[in-house]
Amino acid sequence: MVFSNSNASVSLFRLVALVATLSHLVFTFVDAHGYVTFPASRAYMCKQGQAKNCGEIQYEPQSVEAPKGLPFARKGDGQLCSAGLGQFSQLDRQGPSAWPTTKASGVHSFSWTFTAQHATTDFKYFITKANWDSSKTSGLSASDLESDPFLTVSMNGKAPPRTMNHDLSKAMPSRSGYHVVYAVWTVDNTANAFYQCLDLDFGGGNSSSSSSSSNSSATSTTGSSSAASAATSSTTSSSVSESGTASTASGSGSDDDSSSSGDSSNGSSSDNNGGSSGSTTMPKSQIAQSGACRMKKRRRSPNASVLAARGDYRRHKSQMRRDRQG
């Protein structure tokens, strides 16, 4: 009898464990659906830890499921990204710096990961209007979006594979700056759909204007620096050239000409250098003195015949001294 009770206890334990396992599988299946992995949706950004303060969505990015009809057939203004689900309200944060963005130039397809493959009607992709207010901080509204999807992928009731790419049949709509793509996965055999928001940077507009401005400013600064360097180089070259001219004038003219040339040269050099003496430029007083000294030295130097005569005279004088001593 004890043995029988023991078997009954074991059987009951196994039954409870089996029910718990089946319940877990059922709930996992019900909760598991899908999300956009590239370009990374807000939900996926939260799952990956690339976005912060996400709340519950970081644990179940696949679960943004709500009744069909968004963004236009039913009202959901300000709550489109969360699909009106209060537990995922963090997805409705809005603003150019509220979410990490993906460069639109690198987007040639949209990639989904499905944790449950439902029969599907289609996938549709909407984008914010070209003139939408990208600086707004209130949640995304239907009026922010183009009324027609720029991409529709029909499934005709078929279930997608575990992962699926939707290639762009043509280029992304022409945009500038920060924009949001609203992706809708419509399930065929239920009343629900899944919703994902993707943040893109098209460049050359709102989100990158400060960066462009900074780059432009940096370029301008670099250009100014280059111009300044070129001006300095030009000034230095000019100063050296003018100093050389002054020296030549000193060698071939009078002391007065040399001095005036030096004054003129150094006057220009001083003006070009903003009144400061450059390391490669001699002060005018030194140039004048140098020219005068060279001039005097050249005037006093005897020619070759004089030097030869002096040599002969010294040799003759030395010979006479030797003769007298002998």
From Swiss-Prot:
Biased composition (Low complexity): 207-281
Residues annotated as signal peptide: 1-32
Cofactor: binding details: Binds 1 copper ion per subunit.
EC number: 1.14.99.-
Keywords: Carbohydrate metabolism, Chitin degradation, Copper, Disulfide bond, Glycoprotein, Metal-binding, Monooxygenase, Oxidoreductase, Polysaccharide degradation, Secreted, Signal
Boundaries of every Chitin-binding type-4 domain copy: 33-200
Gene Ontology CC: extracellular region
Glycosylation site list: N206, N215, N266, N303
Subcellular location: Secreted
GO BP: any one term: chitin catabolic process
Annotated residues for binding of Cu(2+): H33, H118
Cofactor(s) for this UniProt protein: Cu(2+)
InterPro entries: Cellulose/chitin-bd_N, GlcNAc_Chitin_IntDeg, Ig_E-set
Similarity field: Belongs to the polysaccharide monooxygenase AA10 family.
Protein name: AA10 family lytic polysaccharide monooxygenase C
Organism of provenance: Mycosarcoma maydis
